Amino acid sequence: MTATATLGGGCFWCVEAAFEELDGVESVTSGYAGGHTEDPTYREVCSGNTGHAEVVQVAYDSDVLAYEDLLEVFFTVHDPTQLNRQGPDVGSQYRSIVLYHDDTQRELAEAYIESLDEAGEYDDDIVTEIERLETFYRAEENHQNYFEKNPQDAYCRMHAQPKIETVREAFAEKVDSR
């Protein structure tokens, strides 16, 4: 059965590339959500005035992957303790955010963060926002499958490639062998 998750953990090019590695992921779409501007553009989101975050919407086969699996990958490939930034990318559009589609996703996200806190996984507080998804706006076409189309891009080699390698190593049993 196809299910959907919407997550933001920094630059969507990098997060998209990481999730595309997983068996059971049917598609990953880069976009914007969590803000107040209707149908925003990349330039508008980058201005920091729309309230939106760069996010990915992951369509996945819930018979192959659980929502909790996606959360585990998500919290492994980005730093949820960085407020309004990820690495060199600074601004609220790069914030850590889980946009839930239903109460079950909300409860699972809250429980997952609580388990990370209890386990002392991070030295700093987790600042990941958990909000109901109101509207997802698909990003412009040049942002879709960006790493796949631009594997030699210096930014992607420096930031997306390590996320991909992390997924391949830490989640080898879940990586798509296509």
Swiss-Prot record:
Q: Which UniProt keywords apply?
A: Oxidoreductase
Q: What is its EC number?
A: 1.8.4.11
Q: Which GO terms describe its molecular function?
A: L-methionine:thioredoxin-disulfide S-oxidoreductase activity; peptide-methionine (S)-S-oxide reductase activity
Any coiled-coil regions, as ranges: none
Instruction: Give a GO biological-process term.
Output: protein modification process
Reaction equation(s) it catalyzes: L-methionyl-[protein] + [thioredoxin]-disulfide + H2O = L-methionyl-(S)-S-oxide-[protein] + [thioredoxin]-dithiol; [thioredoxin]-disulfide + L-methionine + H2O = L-methionine (S)-S-oxide + [thioredoxin]-dithiol
Q: Which InterPro entries does the annotation name?
A: Met_Sox_Rdtase_MsrA_dom (IPR002569), Met_Sox_Rdtase_MsrA_sf (IPR036509)
Q: Name one Pfam family in it.
A: PMSR
| Entry-linked Gene3D superfamilies | Peptide methionine sulphoxide reductase MsrA
Which top EC class is named for this enzyme in its record?
Answer: oxidoreductase
Q: Does the keyword 4Fe-4S apply?
A: no
Q: Is the keyword Oxidoreductase in the record?
A: yes
Residues annotated as catalytic: C11
**Stated role:** Has an important function as a repair enzyme for proteins that have been inactivated by oxidation. Catalyzes the reversible oxidation-reduction of methionine sulfoxide in proteins to methionine.
The record, for HAMAP family, names: MsrA
Q: Which family does it belong to?
A: Belongs to the MsrA Met sulfoxide reductase family.
Under NCBIfam families, the record lists:
msrA (TIGR00401)
What protein name does the entry list? Peptide methionine sulfoxide reductase MsrA
Organism, as annotated: Natronomonas pharaonis (strain ATCC 35678 / DSM 2160 / CIP 103997 / JCM 8858 / NBRC 14720 / NCIMB 2260 / Gabara)
Gene symbol of the encoding locus: msrA
